[in-house]
UniProtKB/Swiss-Prot annotation:
This is Arylacetonitrilase. The active site is at E45 (proton acceptor), K125, C160 (nucleophile). It catalyses: a nitrile + 2 H2O = a carboxylate + NH4(+); 4-chlorophenylacetonitrile + 2 H2O = 4-chlorophenylacetate + NH4(+). Transmembrane segments: none annotated. Residues 5-278 form the CN hydrolase domain. InterPro entries: C-N_Hydrolase, C-N_Hydrolase_sf, Nitrilase/CN_hydratase_CS, Nitrilases_CHs. The gene is nit2. Belongs to the carbon-nitrogen hydrolase superfamily. Nitrilase family. Nitrilase that hydrolyzes preferentially phenylacetonitrile and (R,S)-mandelonitrile. Also acts on dinitriles like phenylenediacetonitriles (PDAs) 1,2-PDA, 1,3-PDA, and 1,4-PDA, and cyanophenyl acetonitriles (CPAs) 2-CPA and 4-CPA. It comes from Aspergillus kawachii (strain NBRC 4308). Disulfide bonds: none annotated. Its EC number is 3.5.5.1, 3.5.5.5.
Length: 328
């Protein structure tokens, strides 16, 4: 495989709370990215059907919550199949952020779809952030395996403030990704109204740079744009976050933290491209490898519980006793 990889990072606005229309727009963006030579295209957090921005204005909105459930994406669905088909037809890796509907419970999810259209992995955000917990559930243990081999290199993904979870980050670093997709909702410049700098466009850019430096990977920082249509659709006027048009700040960072892309204005939609040389990772690895030569696992190590705890499961002792009785 060549060390040269062309990537595309979207900065776009979904068709808010409309599953089918946003799936169509997803495919349009995939086609556009592939036509411009990209081998991988990245989409933001909850790109389908759009991030539920109203949660930062009011914690309960039964009408919108019901609509959101009905328009969230099921993995085994015609809509997902159409995205897979589009990826295969255009021979491009797709890293998709979406609200996953699993038996009408929702999860902040990501899928990595290979250039042959096969889903290589799906994962759920391990813990929804703050008000997101009014909509979304926690992940399962198998979601820790978030890095896979693709035709564009070894690719991994996390969502939003998962990028400030030290243990989760280290576990992801240990899976040896070359390209990392950092998926975010709309992000806005910091102001002095008491909001957290770490939730601003500047703060999250710093988080992306840090991730690149710590992991020695290329980071594709992808964000959503919210226009007036989104503000009106979700009635976020006067809310704490996402109450005005904007939010776009997509970027691409190299494995030493330098920015490799030029920004698109925050209210504008577009795709950012960069030609990556994966061999540049060696330059950073020569100095630091936090899961290799620059580590001390004899002193500090990470424990992981990666099994899936089902909602309904048999007690092991009971199963063994029943089996013994049947043998008698």
């Amino acid at each position: 495989m060549s060390s040269q990889v062309r990537v595309a990072v979207t900065q776009a606005e979904p068709v808010w709370l409309d599953l089918d229309a946003t799936v169509k727009k997803t495919c349009d963006l995939i086609v556009e990215a592939a036509a411009n030579g990209a081998q991988l295209v990245a989409f933001p957090e909850c790109w389908i059907p759009g991030y539920p921005a109203w949660i930062w204005t009011r914690p309960v909105d039964m009408r919108l919550s019901s609509t959101y459930i009905q328009n969230s994406l099921k993995i085994d669905s015609p809509q997902m199949a159409s995205i897979q088909k589009c990826a295969a037809e255009n021979k491009i890796v797709v890293v998709l952020g979406f609200s996953e509907n699993l038996h009408n419970s929702l999860y902040i999810s990501q899928a990595i779809i290979g250039s042959d259209g096969k889903i290589l992995t799906t994962r759920k955000k391990i813990k929804p952030t703050h008000m997101e917990r009014t909509i979304f559930g926690d992940s399962f243990g198998d979601c820790l395996q978030s890095v896979v081999d693709t035709s564009a290199g070894r690719v991994g993904a996390l969502s939003c403030w998962e990028h400030i979870q030290p243990l989760l980050k280290y576990h992801t670093y240990a899976q040896r990704e070359q390209i990392h997709v950092a998926a975010w909702p709309p992000l806005f410049p910091h102001n002095e109204d008491g909001s957290l700098f770490s939730m601003s466009s500047e703060g999250t850019s710093s988080i992306a740079r840090t991730y690149a430096i710590e992991s020695q990977s290329f980071v594709l920082h992808t964000t959503t744009v919210i226009g007036q249509s989104g503000v009106d659709r979700m009635a976020t006027h006067g809310g704490a976050l996402m109450s005005t048009p904007g939010g776009g700040c997509s970027a691409i960072f190299g494995p030493d933290g330098r920015q490799l892309s030029q920004p698109i204005p925050s209210t504008e939609e577009g795709i950012i491209y960069a030609d990556l040389d994966l061999d540049q990772i060696y330059h950073s690895k020569a100095f630091v490898d936090v899961c290799g030569h620059y580590s001390r696992p004899d002193l500090l190590w990470l424990g992981v519980e990666g099994s899936v705890k089902r909602h309904v499961r048999e007690n092991a002792a009971t199963v063994a006793a029943e089996a013994e009785q049947q043998e008698q």
